[in-house]
Amino acid sequence: MNIINYYFLFLVIVLSFKSNGQVPKVYTNISLDRGNAVATVKGKEYRESNNGAGFHLQDLIGNPQGTQTGVKFNFGPKVPSGKVYFGLINPTDGKYPMPVYFRRTAKISASVTEINLIQLRGKYDMSGWEKSNGGFLGYRVMGPEGQLLYDGRLSFKYENDMFRVPPSIIEGPTINQLTDNSVVISMKLNKPGPIVLNVNDTKYESKGKTTIDFKISSLSPNTEYKYSLEGVVTRNYAFKTNLKKGDRTPFVFAYASDSRAGQGGGERNLYGANYYVMQRIVAYSKARNVAFLQFTGDMINGYLAEKQEMNLQYANWKRSLEPYSSSFPVYVAMGNHEALVTYFSNPETAEEFGIDRFPFETESAEAVFATNFSNPVSELKSEDGAAYDPDPKTKDFPPYDETVFSYVYGNAAVVVLNSNYWYAYALNRYPGTSGNIHAYIMDNQLEWFKDELKKYESDKDIDHVFVTLHTPFFPNGGHVTDDMWYNGKNWPRPIVAGEKVEKGIIERRDELLDAMINQSSKVRAVLTGDEHNYAKTKITEAMPRYPENWERPKLKLTRTIYQLNNGSAGAPYYAKEKTPWSDFATNFSTQNVVVLINIDGKSANIEVRNPFTEELVDALELAK
């Protein structure tokens, strides 16, 4: 893309922003100057700034074009040099075929490279592409500083002595929203084109789209279905529907969080995601025959200002789930690193803070998260209509979309919360623009949560409920200064349209605890992350939960549950810190682990394993 086209694209974005350029009423002291946000707080001006390397997903896909000898890519001006690893994928070589990388690489020069596919003939044609006149290619883009930027896929055809890149599945297929009688099979293409899906001898077709969600219904519970995708070569897959609601047949599911880029080089940082650890967690989960994996936040580095850069990091994370995500669902939730931010900075003071991007319907962290995943959708729409809503007649808050929901498998339910909704980076230090703090569940979400727990409490088919959100109720190492503790301070809370909400963070924590422990008999555990370690915390009436100077009412707990924190999926580790409840936090570990939750009728227990060594790190009976 030349500079004129880039300028035109920039102009379109700015004009689009300006045409929707009303500052949401929930914010304060923000104005727009030629499409850019400006915050003026206490006489000091902070202008919108960027934060990120500027890599975009569409650029890294590379606009592949066929040539006489292979496929040519253009990765854009942000990748002027580097190299590309590439290899064929044989779709018939096992259930979960992966790229087998060739011994040579392709050099990137002036942002352009060509993968020579002719050299993959003869003894190097391990996929039979010469016979079928086409095949599948995996490629990895390495930037000028040696960092892996993108892990790509494409299809190619060879006709009339010329290679051609047809509409190709570049992401997926993935199993989503699986129930006992339906499924959503999702995929993304490099360009619009026809896709034919066969499920149980029934054909489904999509045309003219790049993001496709095939919704398949009228399935039978606990049944394996084979499915295939027609293309250059037919690819075969399989999934198994859920147990019927109320079925008490034993099953296991997995839990983890915090897989943003780690240290150690290589795949530990596939631009924003720890591919190395995630791939092992998902492979081990599949080997243990889990029904599903719940992953709750900080998938990626995030904290970015550009949607296309966010999409790139999400794409890399989703690649780490493949090819196993073609056979079982991975449910995801937001963490603070899923933040998509409008940054404000003052160059004279080097101060910086940020808010959730707007327009909320298209640019917010919540909206972009929802476009990248296919989660269930709840009845909770937003915080509009809450007591602090500045204008009940207009939409003033971001959509919850697919960031807050619940789902059922057999006799168990999982309730997913968003503790980073409408998140304003550094709000406690820069409150002038308004926003929400890290870890705070706002009013409408709290009421929805209570209603969900009541629903499952009265449901005779549900024996076990698991609650998951990114931020611990009781942090133990890494986030003692925030999460739902803030070093024992209750004053942190959201600010809406310049006004602080009524309840502080510890008060809101107690309302959540009351709903889970005192008002529910079925919640077995709360699954959290944020802290990059594993720890099991026994939440009981005997556990110290308040600062020494606490003068407000104290919540009495009527039973015991456990907080299972597993933020060990590859982000840089945190060690254990001293807290009032330290004696109640046990089996602390900085090893990478996956929590396996075994359900067998009325009983439930956990098994915590290192997915690399398979060593048992912890075990606990949750219900007899």
Predicted regions and their residues:
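Short beta-strand segments
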Residues: 255-257, 294-296, 333-334, 416-418, ...
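Short acidic, glycine-rich surface-loop motifs adjacent to enzyme active sites
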Residues: 295-300, 456-481
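Divalent metal-dependent phosphoesterase catalytic cores across multiple superfamilies
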Residues: 23-401, 503-522, 533-534, 591
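Bacterial Sec-dependent N-terminal signal peptides
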Residues: 1-23, 516
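Solvent-exposed loop/turn segments at secondary-structure junctions
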Residues: 259-262, 299-302, 336-340, 420-423, ...
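Extended active-site neighborhood of metal-dependent phosphoesterases/phosphodiesterases
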Residues: 174, 224-238, 308, 312-459, ...
